[in-house]
Each structure stands twice: as structure tokens, then as C-alpha cells.
Amino acid sequence: MPIKIPETLPAFDVLSSEGVMVMGQGRADRQDIRPLQIGLLNLMPKKIQTETQFARLIGATPLQIDLTLIRMTEHQSKHTSAAHMEAFYRPFAEVRDRKFDGLIITGAPIEHLEFADVTYWDELREVFAWTQTNVHATFGVCWGGMAMINHFHGVQKHILPAKAFGCFRHRNLAPASPYLRGFSDDCVIPVSRWTEMKQSEIDAVPGLTTLLGSPEVGPCLVEDPGHRALYIFNHFEYDTGTLKEEYDRDVENGTPINVPTNYYPDDDPARAPLNRWRSHAHLLYGNWLNEIYQTTEYDLEKIGT
């Protein structure tokens, strides 16, 4: 089944050209199916790039998805046009009375800030509380996942001495998990962050289970069944060239940065990088959506009751 997004959203043509099944409102209205209602709270500066990355992953399953793009109510995006935000995004204040089968909360390049110093932290905490009554399952990504696990469990993020940057092998620590169905014993995941969550602090919280982890960059994917949440601290959603864009940007700006580990062939930035995570990215998000489909309420309004 396809993902339903506006035909004028930039991702529509991009995904159509890649063979992803997408459809507009007209076709959706002719189908007698209850689509999964998925929200994407996009905290990244490059909204179009990020919304396309996640739409690509959640639009590649047999399930029909109705995607709602959400922004923080008062925060104004500086890197995406006001016209795009007005046309395609709904402020959280406008959707807080709705119910969703799933919600993805993206990362944000604000790791250097304490959580409480983030300008929209108070509203984001409202979002976290709202997920417990209005959302069946939530997926926090990178900083979004760190913020969620901090809010619900007090687990702190820690500044790294050097940026974790590159493609790192991660071990499958829970082969029986429905979220890792079809996963191999290890997989490569893009990493781009200045902070980490410590495994010992996650292990100290009853009920949390680490599903994927790396000896080099630490825990990656954590399940929190008590809050119907997954937290992932790395970037399965990244395009092939995303790390290259970040590296080239820092080099151009004179920002000290190492060549991303295990990304370019022979670690040579002159060579084109290879995507070694795409299949596992689709598996993870497909498994997450399938688990939602198997466990959510048919009557959307019963979620949280």
C-alpha cells in the first residue's frame, strides 16, 4: 500500500521517481481502508530533506500510511521557506486533540545545549506527555530519542571528546525482537553526533532493553515498552550522501572534522560513498509499522483510553 502525502510536497515526485508507492488525496478517498495515522515531528533545519528521508522509509511497506508533518508551535524555521511550512506542516497546538497510531520525533543539531536550555523544551515535554494518551507508538531519533529517554527516565546525554562520525557496525542484541525481524547478526548504521548515552545508565533503568549496540559508539536502539517507545541514537534514515554533505560543509567552514569512519571506500573522500545500511533501514521501519498495525486500535479514538 502507498503512503498518502500531498501531491505538491517535494517528496512526492522524488519518491515516485524511486518507485515508492505514493498517492494523493483523491486516490486515497477512493480506497475503503483505515490507513495508519503517522505523525512526523520534524525538528531538523533542512525540513524537506528530512521529511523525504522518513517518507521514503515508511512508504515502502504493504501498509497504507497517512503522514502528518508537525512542527513546534512557536519555533520558526530559519532554513525552510515559510511557504513550505505553511503549506505542509501543522503546529503541535493544532494536532494535540488528534490520535495517531505512530509518531516519529526527529533529531536536532542542538546537542551542545542542555535540554532545559532548548527554546522549545517546555512544549516538547508536553509532546512527550501527550504521546502517552494520544499516540499508540513513538519513535525518537538521535537527539529526539535522547530527549525522550531523558524526559521519561532521567538518563543523561554525555559530551564526547570527538564527534562520533561515520558508518559503524552494530550488533543485534535481541534477535527475537519483533523490531529486528529479518536483521542479520550485525549491521552498519550511519552515526553523526557529539554526544552519547551510556549503556550502564540505560541498564540501570528497569524495563529498558538495548536492541542494537556498538563497541565503538555505544547503545543505538533501545526499547521502552512502558512508554510504547523506541529510541534510536543513530541515523538509519540518512541518504547515501548525507554524511558527505556534513563533512564537506565542515571542511568548507574550517570546522575541525575527521573523515567519516568506514564511509568512503578506503576512507578516501575523493571516492563516492557506498550505502551499506539501506536494507536494514527499511527492515527496522517496516517492522515498527507492522508492530503498530498488529497492536493498535481499529477505532483510532480508542487509542489511550
From Swiss-Prot:
Root EC class: transferase
Record-annotated site: Important for acyl-CoA specificity: 111
GO molecular function: homoserine O-acetyltransferase activity; homoserine O-succinyltransferase activity
Keywords: Acyltransferase, Amino-acid biosynthesis, Cytoplasm, Methionine biosynthesis, Transferase
Swiss-Prot/TrEMBL catalytic activity: L-homoserine + acetyl-CoA = O-acetyl-L-homoserine + CoA
Residues at the catalytic site: 142 (acyl-thioester intermediate), 235 (proton acceptor), 237
Places the protein is found: Cytoplasm
Protein name: Homoserine O-acetyltransferase
Recorded name of the encoding gene: metAA
